[in-house]
Regions:
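C-terminal motif of bacterial Sec signal peptides marking the signal peptidase cleavage site
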Residues: 16-20
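Alpha-helical transmembrane segments
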Residues: 11-15
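Bacterial N-terminal signal peptides that target proteins for export
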Residues: 1-9
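C-terminal, surface-exposed recognition/capping segments
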Residues: 25, 29-45, 50-215
Length: 215
């Protein structure tokens, strides 16, 4: 009887350790499961495309409930959607007040990143470099000359990028330091079929956002 009593606390300790390890491995801090290459982070689905960086791309744009929906559009650095009749957040008259050559800020800070603010701290708007990886490492299939795109990664998983009214254009979180003024930030652009580039566009143009996240 004494031997059984001495063994019982040890059995409980082992059980607790095994349970804790199982919990951490199974739900990745409660954010994802990875089944079929799909991870759920902060309630949103992300796809593992097998990219060298390991970056996960969201299934949908911000404001969309299906991959085929364009969702909401945002001016660069703003976290409220589709503002067209109000002044740009970072402009006073003709002068840009943040993300300039003077302050040397080249990437959106978390409070100015719509993906981080709206979807949580593990998510962000893709940088120029991250979009360039998507362009370089994936196969792109377009519905038409300026149309929707199915983007298939090295591992065979894919995401769908719907176009907006004037073509396929998506925001990055990167400021365009090469432009002569502080006017531009980088965006993904489809100029014509099979020619997708990451180039500078006006910060005040509204575009959809496709969040990314790291595992």
């Amino acid at each position: 009887m004494r031997k059984i009593l001495r063994l019982f606390p040890m059995m409980l300790l082992c059980l607790c350790v095994l349970t804790a390890c199982s919990s951490d491995d199974g739900d990745n801090n409660g954010d994802s499961n990875g089944k079929n290459g799909v991870y759920v982070i902060n309630g949103h689905k992300f796809v593992d495309l097998g990219l060298p960086s390991g970056l996960l791309w969201a299934e949908c744009n911000i404001g969309a409930s299906e991959p085929e929906e364009a969702g909401y559009s945002y001016r660069w650095g703003e976290v409220e959607a589709d503002i067209v009749n109000e002044g740009y957040k970072f402009k006073d008259g003709n002068t840009y007040t943040k993300y300039t050559k003077k302050d040397a800020k080249t990437t959106l800070e978390p409070e100015d990143d719509a993906a981080t603010v709206l979807w949580g701290k593990n998510c962000h708007i893709p940088t120029k470099k991250e979009f360039e990886e998507l362009v370089k490492c994936c196969k792109w299939k377009f519905a038409d000359e300026m149309g929707d795109a199915t983007v298939t990664g090295p591992n065979g998983n894919h995401i769908f990028l719907p176009k907006i009214t004037f073509g396929l254009m998506y925001r990055t979180s990167s400021f365009d330091t090469t432009y002569p003024t502080d006017e531009c930030a980088y965006s993904l652009q489809l100029w014509r079929e099979n020619t997708t580039v990451v180039a500078g566009t006006s910060r005040t143009v509204s575009m959809p956002v496709r969040p990314v996240a790291k595992r």
